[in-house]
C-alpha cells in the first residue's frame, strides 16, 4: 500500500525508542509465532539480518489477511500501530531485529516512562517558535525534554533535586543541552530573561500568598513579543466539582485578569477535565 503524504511526513518524524536484541529461528518468542499486536502509537520496523521468514498480517480472529516471504533484501514498510502480525521462520539461519518508533510527543513516555506533555502545552507550542525558554517547575522534565528535542533553548527550574537529577540524566543520555537549576519558585526572583516562560500543573502546589509575586516576576522577565503559558487547577465547586485538596486553585476569571495588559492568545477554563478542572492561558507581551 502506498503511503499518503501525511503518513510519509508522520513517519519521517518518528523516533526509535527501543530495539530488540537479535532474534533467531531458535530464540524467536512463542508470541511472535502465534500472533502479536503492535501497540497504539507505536510503529514497528522489521530488520532482517540473515535468512528468510514469512511475515503475516492477521485479523482479530487470528485469520490470515496477507502474507509476505521476506529476506534481507526485501523492502519492508513500517508496521502500523494496532496491527496483528505473525512471524514464521522460513530458514534455520534466520536472524532479525525489531525497532519500535513513536512520535516526539510520546518519546519520553515510551523510553523513560515520563508522563506525556499536557495537551494544552502541545497546542500552545504550535504558536511559539523555538526560542529561549524557561520551564517553571520542570519536575522530571516531560516538557523541557520535548522542547529541547524540538530545538528550543531550555532552562529548567525546580525545587526537587531528585527530579532534576533524573532530568539531567535523561538529557545527557539523549545528548540534549538543557540548563537545569535547583531554585525555589516561591522566591519570585527569576534573574534571566526569556522569550517563553511556561508553568504547567505547578501553581496549585504553591503558597497562595506568593502567586501574584511569581506571575509579576515572570511577566517582567519575559522579552517583548515573548509568551507566557500557565496551566493550573481551577476551583469549580459552583459547577458541582468537588473542592480540590491542593494549596492553591485559581478562581474563575482570575488567571485572565493577571494578563489583562498582555495580548491573550488563548484562555480557557476546563470545568470537566480529569482529575481536576483547570484554567489555562497563553498570552503575549506586546508592550513594555
Indicate where each model-derived feature is located.
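Conserved short histidine dyad/triad with adjacent acidic residue
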Residues: 22-40
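Short, conserved beta-strand element in jelly-roll/cupin
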Residues: 44-54
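Short acidic-glycine-tyrosine-enriched beta hairpin
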Residues: 61-81
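Ligand-binding loop in jelly-roll beta-barrel domains
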Residues: 80-102
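Class I (Rossmann-like) S-adenosyl-L-methionine-dependent methyltransferase catalytic domain
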Residues: 102-128, 139-178, 182-192, 206, ...
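Conserved beta-strand/loop positions that form the S-adenosyl-L-methionine
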Residues: 136
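A conserved beta-strand element that flanks and buttresses the S-adenosyl-L-methionine
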Residues: 198
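Short catalytic micro-motifs in class I SAM-dependent methyltransferases
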Residues: 201-202
Amino acid at each position: 500500500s502506498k503511503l499518503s503524504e501525511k503518513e510519509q511526513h508522520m513517519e519521517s518524524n518518528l523516533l526509535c525508542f527501543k530495539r530488540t536484541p537479535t532474534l533467531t529461528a531458535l530464540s524467536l518468542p512463542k508470541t511472535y509465532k502465534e500472533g502479536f499486536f503492535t501497540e497504539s502509537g507505536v510503529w514497528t520496523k522489521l530488520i532482517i539480518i540473515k535468512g528468510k521468514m514469512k511475515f503475516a498480517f492477521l485479523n482479530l480472529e487470528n485469520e490470515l489477511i496477507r502474507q509476505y516471504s521476506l529476506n534481507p533484501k526485501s523492502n519492508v514498510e513500517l508496521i502500523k500501530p494496532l496491527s496483528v502480525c505473525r512471524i514464521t521462520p522460513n530458514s534455520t539461519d534466520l536472524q532479525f531485529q525489531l525497532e519500535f518508533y513513536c512520535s516526539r510527543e510520546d518519546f519520553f513516555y515510551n523510553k523513560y516512562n515520563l508522563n506525556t506533555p499536557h495537551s494544552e502545552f502541545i497546542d500552545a507550542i504550535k504558536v511559539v517558535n523555538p526560542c529561549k525558554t524557561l520551564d517553571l517547575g520542570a519536575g522530571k522534565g516531560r516538557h523541557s525534554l520535548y522542547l529541547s528535542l524540538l530545538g528550543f533553548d531550555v532552562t529548567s527550574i525546580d525545587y526537587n533535586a531528585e527530579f532534576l537529577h533524573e532530568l539531567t540524566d535523561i538529557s545527557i543520555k539523549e545528548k540534549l543541552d538543557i540548563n537545569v537549576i535547583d531554585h525555589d519558585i516561591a522566591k519570585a526572583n527569576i534573574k534571566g530573561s526569556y522569550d517563553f516562560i511556561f508553568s504547567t500543573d505547578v501553581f496549585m502546589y504553591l503558597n497562595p500568598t506568593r502567586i501574584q509575586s511569581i506571575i509579576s516576576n515572570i511577566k517582567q522577565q519575559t522579552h517583548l513579543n515573548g509568551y507566557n503559558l500557565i496551566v493550573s487547577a481551577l476551583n469549580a465547586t459552583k459547577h458541582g466539582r468537588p473542592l480540590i485538596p491542593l494549596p492553591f486553585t485559581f478562581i474563575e476569571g482570575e488567571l485572565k485578569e493577571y494578563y489583562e495588559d498582555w495580548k491573550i492568545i488563548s484562555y480557557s477554563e476546563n470545568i470537566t477535565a480529569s482529575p481536576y478542572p483547570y484554567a489555562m492561558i497563553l498570552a503575549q507581551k506586546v508592550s513594555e
